[in-house]
Amino acid sequence: MSQSDLESSMRKSVEATQRNFNTIRTGRANSSLLDRISVEYYGAETPLKSLATLSTPDSQTIQIQPFDISALALIEKAIAMSELGFTPNNDGKVIRINVPPLTEERRKEFCKLASKYAEEGKVALRNLRRDAIDKIKKQEKEGEFSEDQSRDAQDSVQKTLDKFIAEVEQHLATKEADILKV
């Protein structure tokens, strides 16, 4: 695994962690909160984004305008059944979700969830490091690398890992600040 391949893989892991962070509620409405909701539409699980336009008319409201009005009730049911704790309001044409301010207890829960997502991201990064180092050691064993080259390559992999873990930590700190901001 070349250094650029490793960095590319690690970048993807960081981006996946960032996407996970985006699904965590903060004090204001954000359409990405609904990214993980899928609706059973004509017998198939369909992402909500594919069925409707999501918008945030103000900081406390998410508005969902389905492309097909017949999907309105299905979308409403999927949102109500999700673990987000939202109560959708259906007016016959659009669904509005009022995003209530978070209680201190919920803020702490969401901080724990963000920490969990960050840890999952770091584990994924460490797994990539392990794979890269195993490959380097294998190449050393086969005689492609000298011992010094192997050590230098392993140090380079570790430095790359440290850089990306610091990035995940930075994203976590930013997300926690967003969550805790009243």
Curated annotation (Swiss-Prot):
**Record has Protein biosynthesis as a keyword:** yes
Q: Which CDD domains match?
A: RRF
Which GO terms of the cellular component aspect does the record hold? cytoplasm
Q: Name one GO biological process term.
A: translational termination
Protein biosynthesis among the record's keywords? Answer: yes
Q: Which Pfam families match?
A: RRF
| InterPro entries in alphabetical order | Ribosome_recyc_fac (IPR002661), Ribosome_recyc_fac_dom (IPR023584), RRF_sf (IPR036191)
Family annotation (SUPFAM superfamilies): Ribosome recycling factor, RRF
Specify the protein name.
Ribosome-recycling factor
Species, as recorded: Synechococcus sp. (strain WH7803)
